[in-house]
């Protein structure tokens, strides 16, 4: 048929904090197989709250001819899977190729810089990567207030924080 009879599972995407994982490939196509977790991103507290950024997207999974065996590596510990590490940092889940219909990879959330999830099959799409963000933190006494664009401006103790999710500038 031209198709492999054993599962084809994608590796997870690497990101800021490390590489993605390797896919699980069992010796029999009826075993549980899944795409690998996305790479670990980085946690930052620049906004005053710990937030994960730049996580890798999970790899997609496709186990042909065995509809119940392929699963995306989306972090369901009840199913015996490891957590998709990249998801904690804005990475997205991978798709499942042998579901009906086959599923695309998930899009990563906006403004966290994470990777999109891998697709589960040739005829569906990978998820889109998340948009980035620029965050500036400075002592309020040094903040000039001169900006372009529409940054979110907040304070945390003695500091002012500017968060740009689109284009803009700050002049110090």
What residue ranges belong to the model's regions?
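Low-complexity, glycine/proline-biased repetitive segments and flexible coils/loops
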Residues: 1-172
